[in-house]
Curated annotation (Swiss-Prot):
This is Large ribosomal subunit protein uL24m. The gene is MRPL40. One of its GO terms (biological process) is mitochondrial translation. It comes from Saccharomyces cerevisiae (strain ATCC 204508 / S288c). PANTHER family: MITOCHONDRIAL RIBOSOMAL PROTEIN L24. The keyword Ribosomal protein applies. InterPro entries: KOW, Rib_uL2_dom2, Ribosomal_uL24, Ribosomal_uL24_CS, Translation_prot_SH3-like_sf. It is found in: Mitochondrion. The modification N-acetylserine is found at residue 2. The lineage of its organism: Eukaryota, Fungi, Dikarya, Ascomycota, Saccharomycotina. Belongs to the universal ribosomal protein uL24 family. The keyword Acetylation applies. Component of the mitochondrial large ribosomal subunit (mt-LSU). Mature yeast 74S mitochondrial ribosomes consist of a small (37S) and a large (54S) subunit. The 37S small subunit contains a 15S ribosomal RNA (15S mt-rRNA) and 34 different proteins. The 54S large subunit contains a 21S rRNA (21S mt-rRNA) and 46 different proteins. uL24m forms the wall of the exit tunnel. GO terms for molecular function: structural constituent of ribosome. Residues 63-96 form the KOW domain. Keywords: Acetylation, Mitochondrion, Ribonucleoprotein, Ribosomal protein.
Amino acid sequence: MSGSYQHLSNVGSRVMKRLGNRPKNFLPHSEKFIKKSTPEFMKSDLKEVDEKTSFKSEKEWKFIPGDRVVVMSGASKGNIAVIKSFDKRTNSFILDENGPTKTVPVPKQFWLEGQTSHMITIPVSILGKDLRLVADIDDEKTPGKTRTVAVRDVSFNGSYYDADYKKVMPYRCVKGQPDLIIPWPKPDPIDVQTNLATDPVIAREQTFWVDSVVRNPIPKKAIPSIRNPHSKYKRGTLTAKDIAKLVAPEMPLTEVRKSHLAEKKELAEREVPKLTEEDMEAIGARVFEFLEKQKRE
């Protein structure tokens, strides 16, 4: 289901999400209808996955665009190809021209620039279980040289901050050999040669240094041009309406609560009786009598 109308409103987003949550008994009929109405060049031979089972992290994908892999099944078995992109609908990968492909007819309204034939060759999605990661490792027989090998499986141990991807990435190792780390491929450089973009090197270049923690680096006369002096958040005073929003309203008291508060107030106002000399002598006599009785026993 296309989500091209989700930007119109939150209501549209909810409708599109509801259409994706189809009843289980309706799924076979829905998938059959979608498959029949989808053009041949847009169909996938793999089964689509739902949002819960869709891969989201590098640990789940194991391979990312830029990795070299060897195809282990199909007509392209044994070919070394480069991963171009993910197919998140089916948890699969799209490879370059060395990967599996198929020739399909394309209606003229979908032709690309420079296309001259109705038949074109397009890549076919392939699952990760049919791929093996290709890596260059040091050759033990020839010191100083490397050899290309296909890794049966990979594991992840620890993490680090990758400056190329600008996020924390897990260490990818050969399964069973945690000391043999296979680095992630570097992402393709972003082309910013346009009038509306700034080169990242220029954007990150520091051209201003703060030389005082007391003096404001912005001139006082320049502040109104940066901040709106008429903003209601910069007034420094609170109106009655603002105070009403900040002060919580008093909750009404029940009759039981009112009687409890009145009784508590009455007890607080009652005078506490003071002990006289006679009372203190009587208490001392009773304590002395009790202690003498304890000694006799």
